[in-house]
């Protein structure tokens, strides 16, 4: 698909919107051109806004008046393109023309500016969001708001990254290393990670920051040995003041990494919340996506975690997986409810460019989108009926069916960290490879980022640079108070 932009700077939103309707096609963006070539979209801003589309035998053009507000001109242009592509495809996008990661944050911002009624009307009439998704957004925003209000100006959360997994799932694009390839890196990485944690803890103490939540992600943190887990968790406990900490989560995502010894190491180090993620309870689906464990291993790991005293367990499912069906997804969700999991997170398959599913030529089609929407609809209806509440929602590009990821929990079991990181409520200090520290000015929306190296071998080989970058944290807070 060729996207031609004339006399405007709206190419980013127009490209993202085009990708909603043509997820498998390369989109070529031209801002300087002499002529256009089919199939094309032409968006121009002259005496009026004009959007023209020509795809095969289909041709259409729509116009709108130009106004003084460039933001409104951009919205008008995107709306015109959405209307034409909707007419061409017959597809009702659940989130309309919204393509951003954080629709709940947008809704909250609009409510603060123009009120609830006007912001809901904006979602429905200007953004073409479906009534069903607006209701979901309304519920999520209300539940998020209660969590956000717990944060103080001096609050922060800690993220610790463990970039190792037993194997790579076919839908995954995260930077991580499989155990068989990276075993020799694990102990050196662990030792240096503890050093970074200690340095970060000292900075937080010097600045008088208040630790609200701790989150171990990855990768799969429980890929580490019990001794290594104890080493890293112990570094957190000895380096930070956890007296005000409301939540300590560890992703124990892969059932094939979970043992009693590791669970005891978590318990001994004040971890109160874990995730054990089946993705599906169909062995055929698990095999198709490269998960080298069985459904029974998940059930065994969940039971073991209960026996070890964990009473706040999240489970992840993915709608739209290869080989899965609507009935298969229903069985998976019903199994999570039968286990009485405190939290069920329903992801939608995202075809990321770095994932092997995408590299192997897997494409999105309308039938798969319809199936994924049926799965997500069943999850929302069933979880709501069982008194689970949506408290965390985000979206990604190239999601099957243009859907969303939603965490549902029993009341009182929401993950605070998930809300804080997605809303960008307060500072997140990150340790480990791939970590991104986000420093937030509590009096504004201003964010400053400090990046760690992505790969474990880089992290180990250039660790001195990681420590030097920590000075940016103190500099940020000193500048706030100068």
Give short role names for the model-derived ranges.
Residues 88-92, 112-158, 207:
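N-terminal [4Fe-4S]-dependent radical SAM core
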Residues 27-37, 354-431:
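A C-terminal junction/extension of Radical SAM enzymes
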Residues 51-53, 160, 276:
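Short beta-strand motif preference
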Residues 1-116, 126, 147, 193, ...:
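Radical SAM enzyme core and accessory elements
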Residues 176-378:
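Conserved non-cysteine loop/helix-boundary elements of the Radical SAM core domain that shape
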Residues 161, 275, 344-348, 419, ...:
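Beta-strand scaffold of nucleotide-dependent catalytic cores
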Residues 209-210, 214-218, 228, 399-405, ...:
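Amphipathic, soluble alpha/beta structural segments
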Residues 155-190:
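Canonical Radical SAM [4Fe-4S] cluster-binding loop centered on the CxxxCxxC motif
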């Amino acid at each position: 698909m060729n996207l031609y932009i004339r006399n405007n700077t709206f190419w980013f939103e127009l490209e993202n919107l085009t990708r909603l309707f043509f997820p498998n096609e390369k989109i070529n963006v031209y801002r300087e051109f002499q002529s256009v070539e089919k199939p094309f979209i032409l968006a121009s801003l002259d005496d009026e806004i004009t959007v023209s589309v020509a795809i095969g035998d289909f041709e259409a053009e729509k116009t709108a008046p130009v106004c003084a507000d460039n933001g409104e001109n951009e919205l008008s242009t995107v709306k015109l393109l959405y209307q034409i592509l909707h007419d061409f495809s017959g597809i009702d996008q659940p989130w309309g023309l919204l393509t951003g990661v954080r629709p709940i944050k947008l809704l909250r911002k609009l409510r603060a500016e123009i009120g609830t009624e006007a912001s809901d009307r904006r979602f429905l009439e200007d953004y073409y969001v479906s009534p069903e998704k607006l209701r979901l957004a309304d519920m999520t925003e209300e539940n998020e708001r209660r969590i956000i209000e717990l944060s103080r100006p001096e609050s922060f959360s800690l993220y610790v990254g463990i970039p190792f997994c037993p194997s790579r799932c076919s839908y995954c694009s995260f930077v991580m290393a499989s155990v068989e390839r990276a075993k020799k890196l694990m102990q050196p990485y662990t030792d240096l990670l503890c050093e970074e944690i200690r340095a970060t803890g000292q900075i937080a103490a010097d600045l008088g920051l208040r630790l609200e939540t701790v989150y171990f992600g990855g990768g799969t943190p429980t890929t580490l040995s019990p001794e290594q887990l104890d080493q890293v968790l112990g570094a957190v406990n000895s380096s930070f003041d956890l007296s005000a900490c409301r939540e300590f989560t560890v992703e124990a995502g892969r059932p094939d990494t979970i043992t009693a010894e590791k669970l005891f190491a978590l318990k001994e180090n004040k971890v109160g919340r874990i995730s054990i993620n089946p993705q599906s309870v169909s062995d055929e689906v698990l095999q198709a996506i490269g998960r080298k464990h069985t459904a029974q291993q998940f059930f065994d790991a969940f039971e073991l975690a209960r026996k070890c005293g964990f009473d706040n367990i999240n489970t992840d499912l993915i709608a739209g997986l290869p080989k899965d069906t609507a009935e298969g997804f229903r069985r998976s969700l019903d199994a999570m409810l039968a286990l009485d999991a405190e939290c069920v997170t329903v992801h939608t398959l995202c075809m990321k460019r770095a994932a092997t599913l995408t590299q192997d030529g897997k494409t999105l089609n309308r039938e798969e989108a319809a199936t994924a929407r049926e799965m997500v609809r069943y999850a929302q209806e069933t979880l709501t009926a069982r008194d689970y509440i949506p408290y965390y929602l985000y979206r990604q590009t190239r999601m099957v069916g243009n859907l969303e990821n939603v965490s549902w929990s029993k009341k009182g079991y929401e993950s605070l960290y998930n809300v804080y990181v997605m809303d960008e409520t307060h500072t997140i200090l990150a340790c480990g490879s791939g970590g991104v520290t986000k420093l937030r000015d509590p009096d504004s929306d201003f964010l400053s980022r400090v990046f760690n190296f992505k790969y474990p071998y880089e992290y180990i080989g250039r660790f001195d640079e990681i420590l030097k970058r920590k000075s940016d944290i103190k500099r940020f807070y000193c500048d706030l108070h100068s």
